[in-house]
Design a protein with these regions (language model features):
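Recurrent small/Gly-Pro-centered beta-turn motifs in extracellular repeat architectures
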Residues: 29-31, 113, 148, 193, ...
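A short loop-to-beta-strand structural motif that recurs across blades of beta-propeller domains
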Residues: 34, 99, 196, 247-250, ...
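Short beta-strand segments and strand-loop junctions that repeat across beta-rich extracellular domains
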Residues: 33-38, 151-163, 197, 202, ...
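N-terminal assembly/attachment segments of tailed bacteriophage virion structural proteins
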Residues: 1-28, 32-37, 41, 48, ...
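Beta-propeller and closely related beta-pinwheel folds
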Residues: 2-14, 42-54, 130-143, 147-278, ...
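Beta-sheet repeat architectures centered on beta-propellers
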Residues: 1-27, 220-236, 241-319, 387, ...
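Predominantly extracellular/luminal cell-surface or secreted proteins
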Residues: 38, 86-90, 112-114, 154-159, ...
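Small/polar beta-strand repeat architecture
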Residues: 48-132, 319-394
Length: 524
C-alpha cells in the first residue's frame, strides 16, 4: 500500500488505506499532532493515551513551590521531559504560556514560573502537549507504524489502528539524530533521521514492537526534509543530507541508495531553507516523475526517472488585465499598452476586441515598454475596435502540490484554489491557463572559439505545435537576443540570418494550446 499526503486546514496529513474486517475499506490518517480512523462510514479520533500525538487535558491541579510549578494530571499521559506544553486558562497569569517541562512520573510534570503566583492555581485550566510525529505512515503485516521526532517508531495493535500500547515501540538508535520521516521499501520499515537511515523488518516479537533492526543496511545518509519523501515505482525518493555535504536527492530501491541529483540540482537545493517542501511521484505517457516543490525559492523540480533527466515545472498565474489598442499590418498585430511589463516571448491573452481574430492566447514580441506585437490573421480589420484588454501571467513554482490516482485517472490538487484536476498528456493547458515550455541548450562552440557564421536554425520534430519563439545568448546567459517566431507546423520550421558567435546557447519558447514534440536544433 502507498501512503497519500493531503493538507487540511493548513495541516499536512498522511493517509493509508487498508482492508478492515469483513472486507470493509478503512483509512488511517494522521498529522504531526492528531490521528483519525475512518471505517464503515464512521470517523474516529485516536484518543488512546499511548498514541504519540497531542492532546488537551484539564489538570487536576497546579501547585507551586518556589519557582517550580507542579502539574497533576487526571490520568497518565505519554508526554516527555524536554517537550513544550502550553498552559492556558489560569487566573494567575504567571502560570500561563509555553513551557519546557520535566516529567516526574506519568501523571506529573514540572515547569518553571516567574513571580510568586498564588498556589494552587485557579481558573478553567488546560494543558496541551504530547509527542510530534514526523511525515509518513507505514502499513506492514497488519500493523500501522508512525515515528516521532525523537526517532521512536510506534506500532498499533494488529489490524486495529485505534489501539496503541505503551510498550509497542522501537527506537532508531544506531546513530544520534532526530526522526525526520518514516516510509517503507518492500517489506522493510525505513526510519529516516537527520544524518542516517535505519531499516527494520517484522520478526514477530511476542511482546513490544514486532520490528527488529536490519543492522547491515544502516547508512549515514539522512533526510533533510520529511515532506520530500515520495514513492514511485517501488522506489523511494527524498532530499538527502550527510555531515560531509549539503542537500541532494537520493533514491532507494530495496535497501540500495543511489544519488540522482546533479551538481546543478544540488546548487538549487542549497539555496532553499527546505522549510516549505512538497513531493510526489507520478507517471505520464510512460515516464515516471519525482516532483519536488521548493516554495521558499519559488521552484519546482521534476526528475524523469525514465530518462534520468531533470526539468523545472512551473505554473502561470494571470495578472490584472491592462487596457490596450490594436492594429495590424501583414499578419503582425501591434498593441499599444502603457507600461505593460511583459517579457519578450511571454504569454498574453487578448480579450474584448470586436474582431475575434485578435482575441485569445498569443506569444508576444516585446517592442518597447509600451508596445508589443504578435501574429494574427492578415485579414483582421485594422484598427481593432471594442474594449480591449491584455492579460499577462506571472510564472512561479508548480501549484499542483498533491497527487492521487483514483478511478483510473491521475489527479492533482491546486494548493490555492482547491481544484482537483486530471493531469494528462492530452491536455495542453493548466486548467485553462497556458503552459510555458522553455527548452535551453548548453553553450555550443564546436570545440573551438573562432567566430562562426550561422545561416539558419531548423527545428527538428513533429510537424505540429503552431508558432514558437527562438532566441539565443552569446554571453553566458547574461542577455538574450530578441525572440524570433518559427512555425513548428511548417515543413521547413526554421529561421534565417542568425549572425555570428564564438559560443552560443539557444532557447525555444512555446505557449500554444497545442501538442509539441521536438527532437533537436539543426544549425547550418
Amino acid at each position: 500500500m502507498t501512503a497519500l499526503s493531503v493538507t487540511v486546514a493548513g495541516q499536512p496529513f498522511d493517509m493509508m488505506g487498508y482492508i478492515a474486517e469483513q472486507s470493509i475499506l478503512g483509512i488511517f490518517f494522521k498529522s504531526a499532532y492528531d490521528a483519525f480512523n475512518f471505517e464503515n462510514n464512521v470517523l474516529t479520533k485516536i484518543t488512546d493515551a499511548d498514541y504519540p500525538g497531542w492532546s488537551t487535558v484539564t489538570p487536576t491541579s497546579i501547585t507551586r513551590s518556589g519557582s517550580t510549578a507542579t502539574v497533576t494530571m487526571p490520568a497518565a499521559v505519554n508526554w516527555q521531559s524536554g517537550s513544550t506544553v502550553t498552559i492556558a486558562g489560569a487566573a494567575e497569569t504567571e502560570y500561563n504560556g509555553d513551557f519546557v517541562i520535566s516529567v516526574t512520573d506519568p501523571t506529573h510534570f514540572d515547569y518553571e514560573v516567574t513571580g510568586t503566583p498564588t498556589t494552587p492555581a485557579t481558573g478553567t485550566i488546560t494543558a496541551t502537549g504530547g509527542r510530534t510525529t514526523v511525515p509518513g505512515v507505514v502499513y506492514l503485516d497488519g500493523y500501522f507504524f508512525v515515528m516521532d521526532s525523537n526517532a521512536v517508531v510506534y506500532n498499533s495493535a494488529l489490524n486495529d489502528p485505534t489501539s496503541w500500547d505503551a510498550l509497542d515501540f522501537i527506537t532508531a538508535a544506531i546513530e544520534p539524530g532526530g526522526g525526520v520521516a518514516i516510509t517503507k521499501t518492500q517489506n522493510y520499515v525505513i526510519a529516516m533521521k537527520e544524518w542516517s537511515t535505519e531499516f527494520f523488518y517484522d520478526v514477530g516479537n511476542a511482546t513490544g514492537s514486532p520490528l527488529s533492526p536490519v543492522l547491515s543496511a544502516f547508512t549515514l545518509i539522512g533526510c533533510a526534509a520529511g515532506e520530500s519523501v515520495a514513492e514511485l515505482d517501488e522506489t523511494v525518493y527524498w532530499i538527502s543530507k550527510a555531515r560531509q555535504r549539503g542537500p541532494a536527492v537520493h533514491k532507494m530501491v530495496g535497501l540500495e541508495q543511489q544519488l540522482v541529483s546533479t551538481p546543478d540540482i544540488d546548487r538549487i537545493l542549497a539555496t532553499s531553507d527546505l522549510s516549505s517542501v512538497y513531493a510526489y511521484g507520478i507517471k505520464i505517457s510512460g515516464h515516471s516523475f519525482y516532483v519536488l516543490g521548493l516554495r521558499d525559492i519559488d521552484v519546482t523540480l521534476a526528475f524523469d526517472a525514465t530518462s534520468g533527466t531533470w526539468a523545472q515545472w512551473t505554473s502561470l498565474t494571470a495578472q490584472a488585465p491592462k487596457s490596450c489598442t490594436l492594429s495590424q499590418s501583414g499578419g503582425v498585430a501591434t498593441a499599444a499598452c502603457t507600461a505593460h511589463g511583459y517579457a519578450d516571448g511571454a504569454a498574453v491573452t487578448i480579450a474584448g476586441a470586436n474582431e475575434s481574430e485578435y482575441n485569445g492566447l498569443h506569444q508576444i514580441r516585446a517592442i518597447s515598454a509600451n508596445a508589443f506585437s504578435f501574429s494574427v490573421d492578415s485579414s483582421a480589420t485594422s484598427p481593432a475596435t471594442g474594449t480591449i484588454t491584455a492579460t499577462g501571467y506571472d510564472e512561479g513554482y508548480f501549484l499542483y502540490s498533491h497527487y492521487v490516482a483514483a478511478a483510473g485517472r491521475d489527479l492533482v490538487l491546486h494548493e490555492t484554489t482547491g481544484d482537483l484536476v486530471e493531469i494528462s498528456p492530452a491536455y495542453y493547458t493548466d486548467d485553462g491557463v497556458p503552459i510555458a515550455l522553455k527548452l535551453r541548450t548548453g553553450k555550443l562552440d564546436g570545440d573551438q572559439e573562432d567566430f562562426k557564421s550561422l545561416g539558419q536554425i531548423r527545428v527538428i520534430g513533429d510537424k505540429q505545435g503552431g508558432e514558437a519563439m527562438l532566441r539565443w545568448s552569446d554571453d553566458d546567459y547574461q542577455t538574450s537576443s530578441s525572440c524570433r517566431p518559427v512555425d513548428l507546423s511548417s515543413e521547413q520550421a526554421r529561421i534565417r540570418r542568425c549572425g555570428a558567435f564564438r559560443r552560443r546557447s539557444f532557447e525555444l519558447l512555446h505557449i500554444a494550446d497545442l501538442p509539441v514534440q521536438l527532437e533537436s536544433l539543426e544549425l547550418g
